[in-house]
């Protein structure tokens, strides 16, 4: 009986690991529109609102964020200010370099090593390890961070956070490009 359960567990692990090859890839979006050019979209003032969910899906925190990006033709400097619903304020400054049409690299003070970015069509994927404060200490959390352009003003950001390959949390963010002139929908 124990051997059957062990065999079932081994088969489940093998099936799960094989199915991970079918994971979403940035290249899957190469022929879709609108095209997200991250250095253009994040240049200027951008506003974001999001939720943090624990591994079981329960919303544990909410935030709003102000992003201010400056692109010099080679490098994007992105200042982020997060205001959490519990009053915590977090600041991060990203330095993002465009390597070629589809590849980016980024660094920030609380990012371990170099983040890798990939851009195709309306999708931008950012992979990095972030030092996250948890109960008085810092934990290394791996981010699988996706931004999907919806139109010229709005993008949706989903980030899966893992530790040792196990999902620990997920972020869902709505991003709005605030320095475009919006059409007037009613007049007085």
Where are these regions (language model features)?
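C-terminal motif of bacterial Sec signal peptides marking the signal peptidase cleavage site
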Residues: 16-17
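Bacterial lipoprotein signal-peptidase II cleavage site
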Residues: 20-24
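Mature, soluble, non-transmembrane domains
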Residues: 107-164, 170-174
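Conserved small/polar residues in nucleotide/adenosyl-binding loops
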Residues: 178-184
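N-terminal helix-cap/turn-to-beta initiation motif at the start of protein domains
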Residues: 29-45
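Bacterial N-terminal signal peptides that target proteins for export
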Residues: 1-7
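Central antiparallel beta-sheet cores of small beta-barrel/beta-sandwich binding domains
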Residues: 49, 53-134
